[in-house]
Amino acid sequence: MIVEYLDTLSPVGKLIPSVGRERAEVKTWEALADGLLDASLLARLEATWAGRSDAERSQAWIDRQLGKVHAALRAMSQGLADKSYCVGIHLSLADIAVGCALGYLDFRFPQIDWRSLYPNLTKLHEKLMQRASFADTVPA
């Protein structure tokens, strides 16, 4: 909601198309990235929750969530195909959402080797990392 409000304040450089098919596509990509983040966060919480003993942790739950992460990565890779951006020919909220999701995987799940599995996502992520807005906000 915040990004949608902020997007209305600028007459140029819209991150979300105002109407039509492209708007639906951007929102679909955003939902896909959000789903990846939801599943990865659930897996992370289950694996690291301080209030639980190892016996109380559910590896099956973690595996289920990571399966969702991998399914989302496959869907993103298929949707991106050989395009430069997720939707259209310019940066949109779709690209930002995907870039943030991939960055979170790098930060919390370095064992997920999405770069070698999905070179087109790697290419998009590298392009996004050339932007100061991405490069300056990488977690330390």
Feature map (PLM): residue ranges:
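GST-like domain detector, emphasizing the conserved glutathione-binding G-site
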Residues: M1-D63
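Non-transmembrane alpha-helical segments in soluble domains
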Residues: V3, D7, K27-E30, L73, ...
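Generic structural signal for secondary-structure transition and capping sites
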Residues: P11, D38, Q78-Y85, P110, ...
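Short, hydrophobic secondary-structure boundary micro-motifs
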Residues: G13-S18, Y85-I89, W114-R115, A135-P139
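Short helix-capping/linker segments at secondary-structure and domain boundaries
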Residues: T48-R52, L105-W114
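Amphipathic alpha-helical packing segments from all-alpha helical-bundle domains
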Residues: W61-L80
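GST superfamily/GST-like fold recognition
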Residues: C86-P110, L128
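C-terminal end-helix/capping segment
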Residues: S116-T137
